């Protein structure tokens, strides 16, 4: 390392101590936030490398600055690996985030004011799928589709009927809180039927898609976007895929010079490392274990009548639980669990009656605990600890028992081996 830990600590003790406290928190907490994961040391090394010094506006072979031969190699590695993972003809690895990837995708497919259909936030969609507080809802005329009120599943007949009525230029598929398999072929059929384009945001399930454990949207979507963290287990960032050469040109222009300047080549390098990890056969085993652990936790809640799992179960890395029979709301549940070192987030549920700041539900994800080595037995234990906490929220003796059990689990599965 150019700047080792001792030098860092001596130079900026305040910042060093803050980072050390966060490392301690991550080690001693059970992380269930579905959008978080644990990256490898190789990913962190790449992201902390000397590549952070280099400015490289443009794309490999077409840069505005000199001295880019090496970063061209780095970015090309990331591009080619992304294409191999997802079977796409074109990939842009420069987006700084999933939201910026989505912004560039919209710019490549539609014009401001065009009508777009996206999943309702309470049904499991994302802010960038048309929420009024997001650039997406402010720039385009978004009309939301929802899940069926009884099954809490996507109702493709209802979505088709709605599309025929509103005649969107674009349909957005994908979710941030939907626990079932999404049939992207049906979304493409609906888009074709009404003359719309299809964009898929697979940010949450990209790792499962990469492992062949969830149907891929790439053959069906005009543009597919994703983050590179979450189930993909890479650095925080975005990725855009397409099989259409003309759209690829528009995507590249939308990213640079459209909404970004120079790419973060140290982050691109970290993406390249994580993509190499995804191509390793061990990643498929990891992804399979994520789903097993998610199901194991969900099964514990399904056996308790005081809790309700949205849509009745899970087929991916996450699930939502209605907690209102046990505690006042999801925010209360989140705060109670924080006190026993279990981290998750409050989450709206379909046809939500409470505000987004309170919510009726919590969202539970298995990606991070699986990366630490938790198996189905440990996952069931985690679910039991959540239930125990929420049902004994004023019993300090019970809460202390939970803290001790959490400590046993986190000690048994360290965040990183020394």
Swiss-Prot record:
InterPro entries: PyrdxlP-dep_Trfase, PyrdxlP-dep_Trfase_major, PyrdxlP-dep_Trfase_small, Ser_HO-MeTrfase, Ser_HO-MeTrfase-like, Ser_HO-MeTrfase_PLP_BS, SHMT-like_dom. The keyword Lipid biosynthesis does not apply. It comes from the Bacteria. It holds the Pfam family SHMT. It is found in: Cytoplasm. Its main location: cytoplasm. One of its GO terms (molecular function) is glycine hydroxymethyltransferase activity. Its cofactor is pyridoxal 5'-phosphate. Keywords: Amino-acid biosynthesis, Cytoplasm, One-carbon metabolism, Pyridoxal phosphate, Transferase. One of its GO terms (biological process) is glycine biosynthetic process from serine. (6S)-5,6,7,8-tetrahydrofolate binds at residues 121, 125-127, 246, 355-357. GO terms for cellular component: cytosol. Pathway: One-carbon metabolism; tetrahydrofolate interconversion; Amino-acid biosynthesis; glycine biosynthesis; glycine from L-serine: step 1/1. Its EC number is 2.1.2.1. The record marks 229 as: Plays an important role in substrate specificity. It catalyses: (6R)-5,10-methylene-5,6,7,8-tetrahydrofolate + glycine + H2O = (6S)-5,6,7,8-tetrahydrofolate + L-serine. Homodimer. Belongs to the SHMT family. Catalyzes the reversible interconversion of serine and glycine with tetrahydrofolate (THF) serving as the one-carbon carrier. This reaction serves as the major source of one-carbon groups required for the biosynthesis of purines, thymidylate, methionine, and other important biomolecules. Also exhibits THF-independent aldolase activity toward beta-hydroxyamino acids, producing glycine and aldehydes, via a retro-aldol mechanism. This is Serine hydroxymethyltransferase. It comes from Streptococcus pneumoniae serotype 4 (strain ATCC BAA-334 / TIGR4).
